[in-house]
Amino acid sequence: MSVAIIGAGAFGTALAVSLATKGPVTLWGRDTEWADTGENPRLPGVPLPPALRVTDRLDEITAETVLLALPAQVLGGFLAEHGAQFDRRNLVSCAKGIDLATLTGPSALIAAACPQATVAVLTGPSFAADIARGLPTALTLACADAGAAEALQRQLSTATLRLYRTTDVTGAELGGALKNIIAIAAGAAIGAGYGDSARASVVTRGFAEMLRLATALGARPETLPGLSGLGDLVLTCTSEQSRNFRYGLALGSRRPFAAGTTVEGASTARAVTQLAERLGIEMPISNLVAGLAEGRIAMEHALDFLLNRPLKEE
């Protein structure tokens, strides 16, 4: 089966570079003037392989399997405009977030726009630069259809990109979305000078929040401790390669953050506060991140916000 990627950002390009080691790949982006230079400025230092073709024409995306590497808050609009032409294909979401307009994950957006498509999710602990440079990386491929999951696992795995499969789409998708919120909180703890012990507490209690909400929304409990949940959480809470962690650092140290940079965790936190209220679930770290991102809570009050909560069993 042929493969194409929608979204020529760093992650979409990295996946295209990796998959091009197995055969021809088409990468679509709105702005592709850089293609003639042989390198995407969003992924500097990584040459585009000969098997990778870059285009800005959606009618040239004819592959049977299409990876949607678009930000979570952009995906819905793209599907509303173009989804019909991608129905009846294998559509793999690479977004990590919750759509603010519908309070649903990317897979639900795809299923609604393309009801005849086979919908899957690709998620897990990874940085674009690592994938593009051929460094060993393991991800989760989730699809409700076990047979399709196995076929996509074989198709999208490469010599350095190892995919594990699951049929728990909800769990895999929520793990990738929710960990971004906790990464912001972990970054804020470090940026504010609270130290590594505080970060460890944020990560651990944050994972408990992830598990509470995900299982309430139908995820299997055993999915979250895997690559798509705990694995991604550990990576993004400990590395400045993570935009969400860097955003938290900026919040904690009261420094400006690069304008125009996509920070999925900030939008996801806003969505999660609404979901948690609807379900009656306590999500204090997520509420804090939403408050910090929206300016409702000042960083100097963040510690009190968490530590002054009632004492309880772990």
Curated annotation (Swiss-Prot):
Entry's EC annotation: 1.1.1.94
Record flagged with keyword Cell cycle: no
Catalytic function, reaction form: sn-glycerol 3-phosphate + NAD(+) = dihydroxyacetone phosphate + NADH + H(+); sn-glycerol 3-phosphate + NADP(+) = dihydroxyacetone phosphate + NADPH + H(+)
Binding site for sn-glycerol 3-phosphate: 96, 124, 126, 179, 232, 242-244
Keywords per UniProt: Cytoplasm, Lipid biosynthesis, Lipid metabolism, NAD, NADP, Nucleotide-binding, Oxidoreductase, Phospholipid biosynthesis, Phospholipid metabolism
InterPro entries linked to this entry: 6-PGluconate_DH-like_C_sf, 6PGD_dom2, G3P_DH_NAD-dep, G3P_DH_NAD-dep_C, G3P_DH_NAD-dep_N, NAD(P)-bd_dom_sf
Family note: Belongs to the NAD-dependent glycerol-3-phosphate dehydrogenase family.
Species for this entry: Paracoccus denitrificans (strain Pd 1222)
GO BP, one annotated term: carbohydrate metabolic process
Function (record text): Catalyzes the reduction of the glycolytic intermediate dihydroxyacetone phosphate (DHAP) to sn-glycerol 3-phosphate (G3P), the key precursor for phospholipid synthesis.
Catalytic residues in the record: 179
The encoding gene: gpsA
Lineage: Bacteria, Pseudomonadati, Pseudomonadota, Alphaproteobacteria, Rhodobacterales
Source organism, top-level taxon: Bacteria
Protein name per the record: Glycerol-3-phosphate dehydrogenase [NAD(P)+]
Molecular function (Gene Ontology), one example: NAD binding
Annotated compartments: Cytoplasm
